[in-house]
């Protein structure tokens, strides 16, 4: 019994030591674990928030980049369409107009009518002076003079038309006034282009 009593005392001493030393340590360890878990939880939450922020930022950047890319594509498309329109105008409108004007204004009969109209216009306006009539370089001066007749050629300084540097049509110079009345093929091309180009664009590109 004495031995058991001694054992009981030893156990009691051990229990007391455990409570006094181990229990606070266990409580401290538990507190450390709890704090570590809370800190880990906060770190995880912060990491999630940072990840979401990075994702949102990436999405915004991608969206902006996409919008810029789309805007660039739209602008490039507009430029391409405008270049195409200009190419079509040059090929179909201007080249066809040049070809048509060259065919019409290099005809001696047409050139003669131009010269006659210019001379009559000057006379109607009461303008006097030395008149020089030029015709296109691809037109026969002899054929034009024959078509005009002496009634008109006699009013010209050179008693007939002279060859100019332009393709077709005619010019009348009033030397004293330094005037040039110009209905050459080049002048007509510029005039018709300015007046007809808008209508041509609307007709050809109205659905573009």
UniProtKB/Swiss-Prot annotation:
Gene Ontology MF term list: ATP binding; proton-transporting ATP synthase activity, rotational mechanism; proton-transporting ATPase activity, rotational mechanism
Gene Ontology CC: one annotated term: proton-transporting two-sector ATPase complex, catalytic domain
Determine if Iron-sulfur is one of this entry's keywords.
no
Q: Name one GO biological process term.
A: proton motive force-driven plasma membrane ATP synthesis
This protein's superkingdom?
A: Bacteria
Q: Per its UniProt record, what InterPro entries does this chain match?
A: ATPase_V1_Esu (IPR002842), T3SS_HrpE/ATPase_suE (IPR009335)
The UniProt keyword set, sorted, is: ATP synthesis, Hydrogen ion transport, Ion transport, Transport
> Which Pfam families did the record assign?
HrpE
Spell out the family assignment given in the record's similarity comment: Belongs to the V-ATPase E subunit family.
Q: What does this protein do?
A: Produces ATP from ADP in the presence of a proton gradient across the membrane.
Q: What is this protein called?
A: V-type ATP synthase subunit E
Gene name of this polypeptide: atpE
